[in-house]
Structures are given as structure tokens and as C-alpha cells.
Regions:
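An alpha-helical support segment within catalytic cores of ATP-dependent transferases
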Residues: 9-29, 90-93, 122, 127, ...
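ATP-binding pocket architecture of kinase catalytic cores
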Residues: 34-145
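Active-site acidic catalytic loop and adjacent metal/ATP-binding pocket
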Residues: 43-47, 54, 177-225
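Short glycine/proline-enriched coil/turn segments at helix->beta-strand junctions
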Residues: 49-52, 77-82, 206-209, 232-235, ...
């Protein structure tokens, strides 16, 4: 029975890709080479003539995110550091799915090659990344209540964690105090379009040049929220690597990335409360993971560390502490509870 259903699905997708190809003969030609790519969990993907990628959203639950990616492409038509969008459809009139046709890019993810680069090459790559981010961030969005957004993400997760008895009484006091600082640190006026999933698996490298991929998580948010994933990857590069590339990740290779970002995109790190804001983002991110895996002590420690940064009595700025290693050293000196401002 399962085999029969599977065969029906294969036949259906074969008919759909043939219809898409037929509708786009001016792009593909009359007898194109079609190869199915076995990647992606929510999309079915085909390589056409080794020049184009047809991405079909076969999961209705992912349609909102898929449309985000199409909108992202349409907002960045002149950005040569992302693939080109040739065609897209969300009307389901002729094809019963959302789909897009984009440029196939050559190369490998940065995770595959970062460890082989000299420091000069790494600086050039981050310069290109900064150029790509600047172009993306030139799309200005309307202001909304960012503090409330983060509070509404954090609090239900925190309640779950308390119900699971993850934190002791002293840790809860720390988290409560850090939460009280959200209003102070999260006020934002600089809302732009961001990629929102920037790590090295989503940056492709070929012959000295990079291109960004995977825009389904894109959103309008404060500019520094672009650093949420990126800064976390810099600190723990193995967390975002595939099984194949994890063996190449050495945190020492990532030490200077924030310094290069400051050099080539100073506006991205200009918020005086950057460390506190990134720490709040960490609290939300790791708390979401922790309530799913309450047995993992490392996730709990990550939440607590973020709360300690937010709760520091002597506030730190990016000018004081620029690299993850410097932040760890600073926190090791200021780790006692005397650093919490109880006034």
C-alpha cells in the first residue's frame, strides 16, 4: 500500500515539473535535462540544465515562509550576492503548489572551506558578506513594538520552564531581573529587512566570491537582529554545521569575524546596548530549545549566561568587548552576584 501511494506521489510530481518546464520553455528550451535533488524537507527541488533550480512548496504549512522567500527575492532584484529569481507563482491555477525558478549557483558552503582560508581571505569574505547585508538592509520596514515582541516570545517559554522545574530559586531571581531589563535594552527604531538565518551553511563560496541562499525566514526587524544567528555561530560554529562539515569547525577560526564586521559594516554593531540585546536574543533562542530538551544542561547554562550579561551592573559596550573570547573573559571577572544592580 505504501509503495502504491509513493508511486502515485512520484507520478504526480513528474507531471507537475513537466508542466512547469512546458510553461517556461523560453527559459529551459524544448528538451531540458531534469534532475531531482534530494534535499529539503518542505520543498521538492529540481535542477534544470544545471543552470536553474525549480523549488516547489509541497507542504501547505510552509507556504507562508515560501512566500517570504519570493518577496525577499523581489525586494532584492539588483543584489548580485544572492541568486537571481526568474519566475514564481503562488496562484495555484495551473500548478497546485507555490513554486519559484531561481539561478543555480555553483560552489560549496563556507563551512566546507573556511578552515582552509588565510586570515586575509577571511576578511575579504566578511567584507563581501557585509556588502550583501547592506543591500538587504536597504529595504526599510515600518516600526513596531520590538520589546513587546521579544517579551511575548520569552514569557510563555519561561513559564513552561518553571513548570518543568528547570531553574532553581536563585536562577529564577536572575532570570526575572534580566527580564525586567527588556524594556531598557530593546527599544528600537531601525527596522529593516533581514535574512534572519545567516550562518555558513547558507553562504555559498565559489572562486573567491560568495552568494547567500535560503530566505524563508526573512523578516523586518531591528538591524542588529541579523546578528542573532550569525553571532551565535561565531561563538559555537559546530552548532550550525552539517554532520559532514562539523569536523572542520574550530572556534579559533572564527575569532576575528566581529572585528571585520565592525570595519566594513559599523552600523550593524553601533547600538550601545548590543551585547545586552544579543544576550536577550540568546535567552529566547536557548530557552525555546531548553523546554524541548530540559535534560540538556548546556542549554540551561546558555540561558543563564545570557541572563547574566543582561543583568550586569557595569554595562558593557561593543567598544569595550568586541569578540566572544573577550566577552567570556569579562564575564569571568564579573561573575559574582555583586554585579546585579538591585536598585
Amino acid at each position: 500500500m505504501y509503495a502504491l501511494i509513493k508511486n502515485e506521489e512520484v507520478t504526480k510530481m513528474h507531471e507537475i515539473i513537466n508542466k512547469i518546464v512546458q510553461q517556461n520553455q523560453s527559459l529551459f528550451g524544448t528538451n531540458p535535462k531534469i534532475d531531482k535533488i534530494n534535499i529539503g524537507f518542505t520543498n521538492t527541488i529540481y535542477n534544470i540544465n544545471d543552470l536553474y533550480i525549480v523549488k516547489i512548496c509541497t507542504d501547505e504549512d510552509n507556504e507562508k515562509e515560501f512566500k517570504k522567500e519570493i518577496d525577499f527575492y523581489n525586494s532584492n532584484k539588483n543584489n548580485n550576492l544572492i541568486p537571481k529569481l526568474y519566475c514564481s507563482s503562488i496562484n495555484k491555477k495551473d500548478v497546485p503548489y507555490f513554486y519559484e525558478i531561481i539561478e543555480k549557483i555553483d560552489g560549496v558552503s563556507l563551512y566546507n572551506v573556511w578552515h582552509t582560508f588565510s586570515e586575509e581571505q577571511r576578511e575579504d569574505i566578511i567584507k563581501q558578506l557585509c556588502d550583501a547585508m547592506k543591500q538587504i538592509h536597504s529595504n526599510i520596514g515600518e516600526k513596531y513594538d520590538w520589546t513587546k515582541t521579544m517579551q511575548e516570545k520569552f514569557m510563555p517559554l519561561y513559564i513552561q520552564a518553571k513548570n518543568l522545574n528547570i531553574f532553581n530559586e536563585e536562577e529564577q531571581k536572575l532570570l526575572d531581573y534580566a527580564y525586567s531589563k527588556f524594556n531598557k535594552y530593546l527599544d528600537s527604531n531601525d527596522f529593516v529587512l533581514i535574512h534572519n538565518d545567516l550562518h555558513f551553511d547558507n553562504i555559498f563560496y565559489n572562486d573567491g566570491k560568495i552568494k547567500l541562499i535560503d530566505f524563508e525566514r526573512s523578516m523586518y526587524a531591528p538591524r542588529d537582529f541579523e546578528l542573532d544567528i550569525l553571532y551565535r555561530m561565531i561563538r559555537k560554529p559546530w552548532k550550525f554545521a552539517s554532520e559532514e562539515t562539523e569536523r572542520y569547525t574550530d572556534s579559533g577560526d572564527y575569532t576575528n569575524i566581529m572585528l571585520y564586521i565592525e570595519k566594513y559594516y559599523p552600523e550593524l554593531v553601533s547600538n550601545p546596548n548590543l551585547h545586552q540585546r544579543l544576550a536577550i536574543y540568546d535567552m529566547v533562542y536557548f530557552l525555546e530549545q531548553l523546554v524541548k530538551h530540559p535534560e540538556l544542561e548546556e542549554l540551561k547554562n546558555d540561558v543563564i549566561f545570557g541572563a547574566k550579561v543582561v543583568a550586569l551592573k557595569d554595562e558593557i559596550t561593543f567598544n569595550d568587548v568586541k569578540t566572544p573570547m573577550e566577552l567570556m573573559d569579562f564575564m569571568n571577572v564579573n561573575i559574582e552576584y555583586g554585579w546585579i544592580d538591585n536598585q
